[in-house]
Amino acid sequence: MTRPIRATLDLAAIRHNYQQAKACSPESFAFAVIKADAYGHGYEQVAAALAVWPTVLPSSTSSRARTLREAGLRQPILLLEGCFDRAELEEAARLQLTVPFHAAHQFDWLKQGSLPAPLEVMLKLNTGMNRLGFRPDEAPRAAAWLQARNDIRLAGLMTHFATADGDPGIAAQLSRFDEVNASLGLPSCVANSAALMRHPASRRQYVRPGIMLYGASPFADQSAAELGLRPAMRLEADIIGVQSLQAGDAVGYGATFVADRPMRIGVVACGYADGYPRVAPAGTPCAIGGQPARLVGRVSMDMLTIDLTSLPQAGVGDRVTLWGGDGVSIDDVATAAGTIGYELMCALAPRVPRRVVGA
């Protein structure tokens, strides 16, 4: 018998969420961001699920892009981080990938000779995130250098917002971007999920929804359900033991939770080795049969404990929803643990059995 824990990945929900993204900006060409193994949802199956739309599938590594090409995917693929050396740049050209150019050292690779095939490039502009990208004063020269190459097609100008999900918003960064592009006149790619949903000025020729595709909210003050998004990942595990406590009894490592009254505690077959956050505190929500419950005690490597006192019918073998259904969102758990839904999705461990629905 396999360990009683499972993750259900809903491809129909991802398609629905992609359509929600498209509805925000119907005239834009919508990237579907599948970096980090499609935020833990499996990049090959997500790419296949979205293949009915003419979209761009950003990937962080050329090896994964190669896998998609070998699987027959012919849509444009953008390497979000760009290439890491000349050899990868040559492979990107052979695979017909789109590559961001973000720093001067990448031009040194081009100086080594012509590429084996024409390469589509986007110029990345650093407008204030201070991660990757040319400074605004460097961008015109970089663009001119690329446009002078016979083996390069400069397809657009892109940037990334640091605070699209809150204050101070995108105005300052977008102003820097537009000032540069006023002279370049390139197609623009600036909107992530948060910008796409809240900042109409960011809806340009290209948009790139990421976290919203997987049914989590990019905002702290608005839930995924309020945004019309459906959860694409549901994590569940079974109760494998029950303990009856008296007042004063402690639960788990460090005895961090002490019962203040008689209680029933359920032991659940999920722990931090499965990707559940060890820092999730007592009170973190879960559900049993649609009824709300909460964690007590410290999350262990393979197990966690929940309060069954108000659920006398619950016992061994009952399924616990840890996130993604029954009123418990991944954002609820992330907030309780002091992190974000992105991290929980990406941290789901390989040992957790996956079940794919909605294909």
Curated annotation (Swiss-Prot):
Annotated positions of the N6-(pyridoxal phosphate)lysine modification: K35
Cofactor: pyridoxal 5'-phosphate
Reactions performed catalytically: L-alanine = D-alanine
UniProt entry tagged with the keyword Isomerase: yes
Cellular component, GO, one term: cytosol
Residue numbers annotated as active site: K35 (proton acceptor), Y253 (proton acceptor)
GO BP, sorted A to Z: D-alanine biosynthetic process
Listed name of the protein: Alanine racemase
Organism annotation: Laribacter hongkongensis (strain HLHK9)
Lineage, broadest ranks: Bacteria, Pseudomonadati, Pseudomonadota, Betaproteobacteria, Neisseriales
